[in-house]
Amino acid sequence: MEFSPFNGVVKLCLKGIQLEENGRHDEALSFFAEGYREASDDHEKFIAAYFVSRQQKTVSDRLKWLHIALDHALVISDDRTTSALPRMYLKICACYTSLGEEAMASEYARLASSYKNIPFDKGPFYHGTKADAQIGDLLVPGFNSNYQAGFKMNHIYFTGMMNGAGLAAALAKGERSERVFIVEPTGDYEHDPNLTDQKFPGNPTRSYRSEFPLKIIGEVAEWVKPGVQELEKFRDKLDQNGGEIIN
């Protein structure tokens, strides 16, 4: 599964998150549990189990579901879940601490600290835009945000997901055609803090940013595009949510 806001399990979890934020925890749990039942692969199961764990009323049950989520994540063990492991280990550590199991707590604290907050993702990487650019060009920071009027971005953003870049192109301002470029970072890059460990654990969208230019090394001809209605609903949600951009 490539993470997508249009994925059925992700949609169920998003509904649960909204209920959770409104204090309707039992209803939220029903959506998360339905997501786990309907999940068809380890990535979907990992996401749903993580949210089920948040609604457990006892530490033991929370720990049980965190281990279930972790088991699914370790089966995958790729760029979609590796970024979530430090937080998962810390949550498990906290459970063992509450239960008085210091040896297990120390082990999971050690596992959490063994991860540095740097991306392991080696690409390929993509950038979605409506800009008129060509192979060989450099995409640089300093342009206005597609999501907040008059806000100049200090970083250039990219993703390891082709379809995610396609969605970014669809959401970009302007009347030109949507384009998805294959890009190569020319310097260090980091997890996008606007998306990492926000609604979902880790960086499932494989979204990154850099203060250094991205070199265009190719262009994608086709990618999976959301339907018109889905895109409009998603755009409306972005407009409603607003929120401060971490720049």
PLM features per residue range, with description:
Residues 98, 103-123, 130-133, 146, ...:
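Conserved NAD+-utilizing ADP-ribose enzyme module
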Residues 7-30:
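Alpha-helical segment of the N-proximal tetratricopeptide repeat
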Residues 1-3, 35-42, 73-83:
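Flexible helix-coil transition and linker loops at the boundaries of alpha-helical arrays
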